């Protein structure tokens, strides 16, 4: 008989071996922040054991997002795996339903995950988020500042033991709208997905940091971001890269502006999948974040979410107020999926699926 259980530290080796097998990866290297014996309990692994061995697993990683002084708790869903010989038996449906209920019971307002849109749409997740990619080619450097202007920069690997560099990196990182990383887990967190952190220095002086894998920089923070073209040229020289791609999130307005002015080309992609459990709290937090980052005009919108509630979202010059109401006619009526696309993808009417 199949048994659903929450893994404990004693299950570390069995769970890790299982997901290594399903994904054909070495998770202790791929995701050091969780898949070591000392870090394993940072995540919750909900598993099904059938006939004495693991058949399926879903991991829940608690996360905190912070913008300035405001933060919100959420969850990242990962390591979604089923043994090849146990597929089609409904174990993933059982685990995902269980995890969703656990998060609802805890009051977690939303969860997100990476993966196939239509696979996870079955469980109520919708494609969400935007990220911008800016591509720099050798000609961008050669025809502007020249590579000689890049020779003074160097890149030192960042280790957890490098207290002085780590402190400088943390100060830059904490200026972002970001997933909270503590000083203790900063480097293991940065190394997730096989990225590698480097400190950027010029004549021995700290200039910032990059998070790089192959020809892609997933994070870049500089003391003076106007020097990004010099740093790009130095990265190309140091790492032997001809075409360098830099990722920046939509809310990083000034960073995107500078990168767009200096790069060869750019494109936009969606980010992942999201499921909202508490619409009031989620909308309230991200609308307030949007107000702080952008110049949103004061106003009020009544939104009816099919199968949920009707919400009043009121923006003033100083705050955003989100309430559940039942006395006013809605300005728009949307499904939960349409709401996520409307609020988090910036794709226009043809993406949101309704006429604004």
Task: Walk through the language-model features, giving the residues of each.
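A glycine-centered beta-loop-beta connector
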Residues: 49-53, 201-205, 355-356
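Conserved GNAT acetyl-CoA-binding A-motif
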Residues: 96, 101-115, 239-250
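Conserved acetyl-CoA binding element of GNAT-fold acetyltransferases
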Residues: 72-84, 215-225
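Active-site/acyl-donor-binding loops of N-acyltransferases
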Residues: 118, 126-144, 226, 233-354
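Amide-forming acyltransferase catalytic core, primarily the GNAT-like/NAT-type
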Residues: 131-240, 280-297
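Short amphipathic alpha-helix that is part of the acyltransferase structural core
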Residues: 1-62, 69-76, 142-184, 215-216
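Conserved acetyl-CoA pyrophosphate-binding loop and the N-cap/start of the following alpha-helix
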Residues: 86-98, 108, 226-234
């Amino acid at each position: 008989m199949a048994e659903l259980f929450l893994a404990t530290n004693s299950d570390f080796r069995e769970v890790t071996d299982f997901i290594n097998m399903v994904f054909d990866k070495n998770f202790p290297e791929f995701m050091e922040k969780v898949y070591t014996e000392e870090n394993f309990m940072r995540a919750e692994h909900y598993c099904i054991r059938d006939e004495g061995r693991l058949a399926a697993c879903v991991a829940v990683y608690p996360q905190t997002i912070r913008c300035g002084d405001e933060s919100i708790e959420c969850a990242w869903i990962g390591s979604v795996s089923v043994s090849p010989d146990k597929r089609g038996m409904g174990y993933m449906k059982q685990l995902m339903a269980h995890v969703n209920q656990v998060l609802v019971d805890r009051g977690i307002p939303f969860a997100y995950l990476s993966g196939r849109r239509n696979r996870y749409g079955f469980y109520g997740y919708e494609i969400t988020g935007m990220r911008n990619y800016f591509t720099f080619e050798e000609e961008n450097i050669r025809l502007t500042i020249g590579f000689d202007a890049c020779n003074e920069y160097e890149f030192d690997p960042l280790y957890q033991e490098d207290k002085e560099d780590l402190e400088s990196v943390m100060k830059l990182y904490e200026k972002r709208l970001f997933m909270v990383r503590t000083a203790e887990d900063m480097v293991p967190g940065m190394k997730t997905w096989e990225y590698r952190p480097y400190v950027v220095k010029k004549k021995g002086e700290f200039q910032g940091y990059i998070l790089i894998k192959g020809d892609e920089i997933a994070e870049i923070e500089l003391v003076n971001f106007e020097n990004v073209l010099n740093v790009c040229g130095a990265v190309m020289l140091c790492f032997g890269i001809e075409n360098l791609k830099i990722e920046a999130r939509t809310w990083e307005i000034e960073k995107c502006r500078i990168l767009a002015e200096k790069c060869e080309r750019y494109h936009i992609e969606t980010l992942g999948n999201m499921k909202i459990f508490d619409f009031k709290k989620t909308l309230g937090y991200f609308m307030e974040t949007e107000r702080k980052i952008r110049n949103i005009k004061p106003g009020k919108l009544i939104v009816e979410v099919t199968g949920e509630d009707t919400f009043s979202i009121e923006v003033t010059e100083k705050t955003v107020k989100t309430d559940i109401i039942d006395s006013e006619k809605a300005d728009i009526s949307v499904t939960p999926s349409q709401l996520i696309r409307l609020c988090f993808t910036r794709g226009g009417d043809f993406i949101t699926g309704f006429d604004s």
